[in-house]
Amino acid sequence: MCLKKFFLNTVSFINTDAIKTVLDIGCGPGHLVVKLLELEKDVTALDIAPNMLSITQARVDSMTFSSNFETILADYSAHEFDKTFDAISVMGFFDYVQDPVAVLQKLISDANKEIYISIPGDKGFLAWQRRVRYKQRNCPLYLYSRDSLVQHLQDAGCYEMTEIIDTERGFYIIIRK
């Protein structure tokens, strides 16, 4: 499952009347944000990179939406929200997470209903290639086996409410509260 498939699956799951507010963690250039605003969801876009939030904001500003939208420049792990969200989308984020259990526990507390997460797998040529590239850049990279993922979910106390879908590049996780 490539990122486009993750994106399409996440949009289809969120496209329900039960989901009204969405947090997009690591929103990048805002592709998912725009789609969710088109679906009339209230969206909070969080990213640690100011340039990504600028691109997202410009994209949103160029369109007309009736939904609420805000950006937050922050490290998700360190940010405290004054509200919870019906759904949280986490794509391309766990690659950089040193303590996945703490992040999973925070996600559970910040979500009212559902969480959609892409998790990078540790198998195959692409995983090997990423390891080499990130090592050359002296950048930490975290990849997961199915067993390590299950252990993290159990340690975070959310394994029983989790659906794990194996993909060619890793895993797509849905946590339903």
Q: Where are the regions a protein language model picked out?
A:
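A conserved beta-strand element that flanks and buttresses the S-adenosyl-L-methionine
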Residues: 89
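Conserved beta-strand signature within the Rossmann-like core of class I S-adenosyl-L-methionine
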Residues: 112-120
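Short alpha-helix
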Residues: 140-157
